[in-house]
Amino acid sequence: MYKRQKQPYIRQFENYVGILMGHYPESCEQRGVCSFQNIVEADGSVYPCDFYVLDQWRLGNLNEDSFETIHKRRLESGFVEASYNHTEECKGCRYFMICRGGCRRHREQTGDRPGENHFCASYRMFFDACLPRLKDIARSCMR
């Protein structure tokens, strides 16, 4: 397909190229931090993320709670703020500018200490092999 000039769209790679071009990634997983979302289930229950549709993260229910109440609970939960916690090793990694630590669900905290992304070694292997090519693609897109 690629050789016939019909390039596939692969969100993760498109976001990497965009990051290298100075754009903000559209995928929250590639931002390295969570955003404010309202995931609404069929029963009206609201959660901060589609990967955290769990009782402990339920912010309320649209049938019972106002948006103001739900937003207040989100702030009180510290859900988004917790996603800013990265290990010092992660922040110092040569690939942090493009990896950004990945999704919070892949680096859950243990106690007070931020967790390491369990795909970290894989990301390093990938970027060791592919970052030069991604940079070439980004440069060619900016021409």
Could you tell me what each predicted segment is?
Residues E41:
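Short, acidic, Ser/Thr-enriched surface-loop or helix-capping motifs
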Residues Q5, S45, L54-W57, N85-R143:
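Radical SAM enzyme core and accessory elements
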Residues M1-L20, F51-R94:
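C-terminal accessory region of radical SAM enzymes
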Residues R31-C34:
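Short, small/polar residue-rich loop motifs at catalytic or cofactor-binding pockets
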Residues P25:
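Histidine/acidic-rich helix-loop-helix segments that form or flank divalent-metal centers
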